Amino acid sequence: MIKRKIWCNLCIDLVAFTSEIFKGAVFQSLDGIVVSANCKLRKIFTLKSKPQDTADKDAVCGVPFSTDEPTDIIPRSCQLMTDVPHVTQLLNMTKLRQTEIKFGGHPLRSAESDQFINRGTGSTRNSKNQDVCHIAFGSKVLGPPPLSGRRSNMRISSETVRSVGSKNNRSCQPSTVEKHVNGTEMSALLIPESEEQGNKENIHHIKQTVPIHAANLPIMHPHPPQEPSADKNNNRRRLRLKSTSRERTETPSGNSSGNNTNEVKAATVLTTVSQQEAGLLNSSTLGPQSPDQSDEWIFPENADHVSYLASSRQSLLLDDDSCHPSHLWLEASKESEHDQQAEESQSVPKDIFTFSSRPRSAPHGKTQTMSPEEVSFILDLKEDNSVTSRDTQSEDDFYGGDSSEEGDHSIQGSRGPTTGPSELTQLTSESLLGEAAKRTSKEYLKSAYTEAGATESQDSSAEQIDRNNFQMSSLPTTCFSPTGRRCGSCQKTPDPVIKAKDLPAQQVPASLNKTSLKEISGERLSSIPEASEYDWRNYQPSQMSESELQMLASLRRQQNEELEDAGTSHGLSASQVDNCNVSISTSSDDTTTWNSCLPPPVNQGHHYQKEMNPPSPSNPRDWLNMLSPPIVPPSQQPAEQRPDSSESLSVQGEEDLSVEEDEEVLTLLYDPCLDCYFDPQTGKYYELV
């Protein structure tokens, strides 16, 4: 019936099969395909009309091809090369009936095909139930239900009914059990629910114990076996194409099992060539992949050992609003590995990528997660410019899922030279799908990405990269920053030395020569009017503005994560714990911390880490109940302050890299309220000479 040893574009007319098998039904769409045969599939696609049948009419079916129907041309990207011998065959009910008569059988009537196709419902339905209408795979079909008892049902499904060509050949040869497959076979039946449970244990077996001496590759209608099979649970391997939200096993012959009453015209083209060599079936070609095996993208140049299926939605499925007939094209190869590779370079364009997916049911209530391999491939696709808008939309579904919000999944915003999988995930979503703040409800990542982008041009040390890694923490943490306060004197007395443009939300460390500095004594420090007016009780969080509370929340979380990474305890003094009583809950911290109207600060507060060490006698600020240099929000800063040319502001993150052995250079923090510089190492105050 179907030619062997040659490339074959097998077109299956699903419209004809649907209307003949299910009386009154109209074909609408194809939800899935089950391939159960010893063949290799090259491509699957749909056509609006039937292609021209180029096979030998007399040898194949004895029926001339009707030329009055509209024909379609196979797309250029899916055509075989002209120097490759191939045929195009069209299968419909008319040709099947003619083949039956030619090989001496009786023509298959619709009632018989209806009975065999729907035999699976008999085991679950009471045989006494003789309704005028019965349910065939979810659709109501006119006519009495098929008469099927359990014994005949088991006997029929044990061989998963052969078609005429294979049935005729097999009747001439002894049916002895062999350990190899000497031919090809494609099942034209949906496995009924009752039998599918029994067959599930044998799905992953590789050896096929039932002999198939078939000269052809049948994809025909079911027929009862002439003799019972030696193995009742035939080891059948199913390759499944997932397409729409409802998954079901579908045969190439078009026995659509879902909405048969709403089905639109389509025909399926199957390109298949049988394998000649006897031996074990290649489980990577046909067998379902094991559940722990991940899906993989297969490139044309290195995919010669895998039977891959182009399952992209735009090529496999009709759009919901399309009412045109379509074809499904399955190709199969018989060549050896070397010939396959040579032919693949001819027949498969370089820009066609395929994705092979293992059979599984659709997840309920869960979104899909991505493995790092798939994430890295998305980056390659972006460079290839081969991602369509539809693909990007599906990737958007991936990144909107739960995987980016797991508590222990660290999402890092750094762009270091070595990026882990979680960094890759975030960077990919940023480059493909917009800014990272839209990817997760943890909106404080927005500030992390802004900081990472702002310091990328100045970044010269690995420590800077490390400190830009802001990771998610699902627990509220203790505050490691001192309580900020409003600095009223900053706005009244602008300093000519330090201007506000270089003072983001924190004090920038300045490397100054010690010869240009003069230490301020304790008496002099206490005599400064701004310092004497300060009382920390006036600046508790209850009197803070919302923006200051937000900065404290972010700073506290930041410091806690940095110290957690280092594995050290916070070692706060009692005064710092008392002063930092900003209560932050997990829920409020997640979504309402940052408002888009506030510009996120650049790397705020990272230099405070030195002050978070356990209190020591060399740091009197811990014992004197004094606070660190205040956090000045951008709205509170004087607008006209700028640094003098006499001081050089070091790049943040190089603070530890400054020459601390040389006592002539000090790394100081400027305190605008006290109008002096503070040395976090010694706790001393300095002013410019």
From Swiss-Prot:
**What is the superkingdom listed in this entry's lineage?**
Eukaryota
Give residue spans, biased composition: Acidic residues: 394-405
Listed Low complexity bias regions: 583-593
Q: Which InterPro entries match?
A: CFA20/CFAP20DC, CFA20_dom
Return the Polar residues bias intervals: 150-176, 343-359, 411-421
Positions of the UniProt region annotated as Disordered: 143-179, 217-236, 241-262, 333-424, 583-660
PANTHER family in the record: ORF PROTEIN (PTHR12458)
- Identify this protein by name: Protein CFAP20DC
